[in-house]
A protein has these predicted regions:
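Hydrophobic helical h-region of N-terminal Sec-dependent signal peptides
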Residues: 6-14
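N-terminal module-boundary/linker segments of secreted carbohydrate-active enzymes
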Residues: 25-118
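Active-site acidic/histidine clusters and adjacent loop/turn architecture
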Residues: 100-165
Length: 260
């Protein structure tokens, strides 16, 4: 059998020479024989017998982004509206009818926990005169581990309150009127804040905003993210003189707090 294999290899080599236009190939029969005679290797024994240098230090730990989640420090800061934010809101939530300048407002960076307990970084625009107080409120809410789904400027929703609510977004400044009236909302002056609209819907008769809030009209069935009398959100705002829309008779605006 070995002789047949050797003969086949030699014939194969000559065929390569013929196809290659006369190129010379050295045939080393002993190499072919050695390959044929080679015994299969027991890989377990082979690798087990490799000498190991025990003086090599352990490699440094490289964080796995899918396993080693980084927990950042919470942030609660205020600053004048940055240029890129002015460009974002100009002509959107802040338009020609606004009776004050950009310096009337302040830009907040606020850390909060989402419904999975993850640390998130949100942003709000409020009146500059209450900026520090709002930061204190949300820092208190943060340390109480009250979940807030998201916190984005209304301009990411084309300044349309309904779409922001449908996305369960918590928001403050938006120069607009009170729904169904010509009266300016406290949101128009950066003096009102809405939190978790789905868990805390606006209810007026048969009207429920946002629509998904229908699951939370039973205020006795308390679930995460709901604002109720005595909860951390309620206490943080009410203790500082804010008014809660959930205490109104009609409408009941459970997600709404305002400063007067």
């Amino acid at each position: 059998m070995k002789k047949i294999l050797i003969l086949l290899m030699i014939l194969w080599a000559f065929a390569l020479v013929a196809c290659g236009g006369g190129a010379e190939i050295e045939i080393r029969n002993y190499d072919i024989i050695d390959i044929i005679n080679q015994q299969p290797v027991d890989e377990e024994v082979f690798y087990h017998n490799i000498p190991v240098d025990t003086n090599i230090d352990e490699p440094p730990h490289i964080p796995d982004p899918y396993i080693d989640l980084v927990e950042y420090e919470p942030i609660f800061t205020m600053q004048p509206l940055p240029d890129h934010i002015i460009r974002l809101i100009d002509g959107s939530s802040f338009h020609a009818e606004v009776p004050f300048g950009f310096d009337f407002l302040t830009y907040l960076t606020i850390s909060h926990r989402d419904f999975e307990g993850n640390l998130q970084q949100g942003h709000m625009i409020v009146a500059e005169e209450i900026g520090k107080e709002v930061l204190e409120i949300f820092e208190e809410i943060f340390h109480a581990n009250f979940p807030i789904e998201r916190m984005r400027l209304i301009d990411f929703y084309n300044a349309l309150d309904y779409y922001s609510m449908a996305d369960n977004n918590s928001v403050a400044f938006n120069f607009r009127t009170i729904a169904g009236t010509n009266i300016l909302s406290r949101h128009a002056f950066g003096m009102a804040i809405d939190i978790n609209p789905i868990q805390n819907p606006y209810i007026r008769g048969d009207i429920i905003w946002p629509a998904d809030g229908i699951e939370y009209i039973d205020r006795e069935n308390i679930r995460p993210g709901m604002i109720t009398p005595g909860c951390p959100v309620y206490t943080a705002f009410i203790s500082r003189g804010w008014i809660w829309g959930g205490n109104w008779t009609s409408p009941r605006d459970y997600h709404h707090f305002e400063r007067r």
